């Protein structure tokens, strides 16, 4: 079994997911959350130390438009996460761009967050209630997921498809 840590970076908080796969498919979510960036730095160091996780992080791409301070702050955090992964593993994380996620999961660059979430549900939790979250009594594949955690799962799935399964995007 292999393990992937995927990060959807933000300027203050970031979504992350740790998933386990068997080379054929992602089989389960081990951990998911949205936490303060400085806490995530510590978590990265703790989780990666000697564990052999693959690491993927969503990378910001230039779109030809003016951006605000939040985007630049997010870029700084991407660099800090990158450096921590490099120190712990000897290699940097794999960059996953949003356009790759859209193509991999939806087959279209015009896909929106709702389309990506539905593609994830269709793939990992078909027929499960509440977008695959289930209930407290009967948790589904995506139990505990909210907001940026879905984006982190899209990063993990795209990384898995592209680098583990070898799907051409």
What are these regions (language model features)?
Residues 1-169:
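Phosphate- and other anionic-substrate recognition elements at nucleic-acid/protein interfaces
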């Amino acid at each position: 079994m292999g393990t992937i840590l995927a990060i959807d970076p933000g300027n203050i908080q970031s979504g992350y997911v740790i998933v386990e796969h068997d080379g054929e498919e992602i089989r389960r979510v081990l951990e998911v959350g949205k936490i303060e960036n400085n806490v995530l730095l510590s978590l990265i160091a703790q989780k990666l130390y000697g564990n052999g996780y693959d690491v993927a992080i969503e990378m910001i791409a230039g779109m030809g438009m003016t951006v605000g301070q939040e985007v630049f702050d997010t870029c700084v955090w991407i660099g800090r996460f990158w450096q921590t992964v490099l120190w712990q593993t000897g290699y940097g994380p794999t960059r996953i761009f949003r356009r790759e996620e859209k193509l991999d999961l939806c087959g279209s660059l015009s896909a929106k967050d709702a389309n990506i979430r539905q593609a994830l549900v269709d793939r990992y939790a078909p027929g499960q209630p509440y977008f695959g979250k289930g209930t407290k009594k009967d948790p589904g594949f995506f139990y505990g997921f909210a907001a940026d955690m879905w984006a982190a799962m899209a990063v993990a799935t795209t990384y898995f498809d592209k680098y583990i399964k070898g799907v051409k995007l």
